[in-house]
């Protein structure tokens, strides 16, 4: 299978997000990379599902709470930026304070 660098990045994000989902389901608090991967993958999927940029940005703030992550993680993630594929093309999505 031949993948472009962007496709490899997306696959890596998805894999890390899947691991984060499993750990969260077991009741573990997520660390920084797990939280970023979970939010990033969810944003990419929401865009692919046809949501608008504004909807994806808002959705990004509803995925995790402070109770879901280790202490200090929300402060380490002031914003998340991801290039997501929407029905009308690729756009940069920025979510400010994704873990309120």
Swiss-Prot record:
Subcellular location: Cytoplasm
Top-tier EC class: hydrolase
Enzyme Commission numbers on file: 3.5.1.5
Keyword line: Cytoplasm, Hydrolase
InterPro entries: Urease_gamma (IPR012010), Urease_gamma/gamma-beta_su (IPR002026), Urease_gamma_sf (IPR036463), Urease_subunit (IPR050069)
Any GO CC annotation of this UniProt entry: cytoplasm
Reaction catalysis annotation: urea + 2 H2O + H(+) = hydrogencarbonate + 2 NH4(+)
Protein's pathway: Nitrogen metabolism; urea degradation; CO(2) and NH(3) from urea (urease route): step 1/1
GO molecular function: nickel cation binding; urease activity
Similarity section: Belongs to the urease gamma subunit family.
Protein name as it appears in the record: Urease subunit gamma
Lineage: Bacteria, Pseudomonadati, Pseudomonadota, Betaproteobacteria, Burkholderiales
Encoding gene, per UniProt annotation: ureA
């Amino acid at each position: 299978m031949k993948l472009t660098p962007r496709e490899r990045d997306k696959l890596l994000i998805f894999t890390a997000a899947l691991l984060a989902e499993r750990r969260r389901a077991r009741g573990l608090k997520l660390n920084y990379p797990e939280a970023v991967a979970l939010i990033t993958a969810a944003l990419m999927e929401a865009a692919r599902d046809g949501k608008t940029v504004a909807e994806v940005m808002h959705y990004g703030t509803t995925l995790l709470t402070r109770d879901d992550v280790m202490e200090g993680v929300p402060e380490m993630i002031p914003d998340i930026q991801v290039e997501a594929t929407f029905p009308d093309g690729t756009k940069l999505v920025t979510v400010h304070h994704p873990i309120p």
